Swiss-Prot record:
<dbReference type="InterPro" id="IPR034169">
    <property type="entry name" value="NifX-like"/>
</dbReference>
<dbReference type="Pfam" id="PF02579">
    <property type="entry name" value="Nitro_FeMo-Co"/>
</dbReference>
<dbReference type="InterPro" id="IPR003731">
    <property type="entry name" value="Di-Nase_FeMo-co_biosynth"/>
</dbReference>
<dbReference type="GO" id="GO:0051540">
    <property type="term" value="F:metal cluster binding"/>
</dbReference>
<comment type="similarity">
    <text>Belongs to the NifX/NifY family.</text>
</comment>
<protein>
    <recommendedName>
        <fullName>Protein NifX</fullName>
    </recommendedName>
</protein>
<keyword id="KW-0535">Nitrogen fixation</keyword>
<dbReference type="GO" id="GO:0009399">
    <property type="term" value="P:nitrogen fixation"/>
</dbReference>
<dbReference type="InterPro" id="IPR013480">
    <property type="entry name" value="NifX"/>
</dbReference>
<dbReference type="InterPro" id="IPR036105">
    <property type="entry name" value="DiNase_FeMo-co_biosyn_sf"/>
</dbReference>
<dbReference type="InterPro" id="IPR051840">
    <property type="entry name" value="NifX/NifY_domain"/>
</dbReference>
Length: 143
């Protein structure tokens, strides 16, 4: 099952800008159907652009797809970097209609951008992780 987030004011339509959204409904979606996993409520957006983006991003980090009414360039780049595929839809698009499409498509090959996100989220084999950490230490980049 994939987790898919919807920026919604009322739970029925995608109608919120990512940076100002105070509610994300997260659904689990698979070929058998979908169900509401969780409604995530956030505080009013901060005036600080970084804080605003980070708090919204933290609310959806476990999701593969993020449906929003609008999103700024900086926020979109951070969402993509977090391995989440942002989908900008027309404001007022029905959450149910989108879920119907996601369920229908769940048994098929995902679109290339979603496939890329899923591949990026796959756990790396231990040897690859180890090789990267050793290389970082040799360069002096150890975390």
């Amino acid at each position: 099952m994939l987790k898919i987030a919807f920026a919604t004011g009322d739970g029925t339509a995608v109608d919120q800008h990512f940076g100002w959204c105070r509610r994300f409904d997260v659904y689990e979606v698979g070929p058998e159907g979908s169900h509401l996993f969780e409604t995530r409520l956030l505080e009013a957006a901060s005036d600080d652009e970084q804080d605003k983006i980070e708090s919204r991003l933290a609310a959806v980090t476990d999701c593969v797809i993020l449906n929003i009414g609008d999103i700024g360039g900086t926020a979109a780049a951070k969402v993509v970097k977090a391995k989440i595929h942002p989908v900008k839809v027309a404001k007022g698009t029905s959450v149910e209609d989108l879920l119907t499409r996601y369920v229908r498509d769940a048994g098929r090959d995902p679109p290339p951008l979603v496939r890329k996100v899923l591949k990026a989220r796959e756990p790396q084999p231990a040897a690859q992780s180890w090789t990267r950490s050793v290389a970082a230490e040799l360069k002096g980049d150890a975390a």
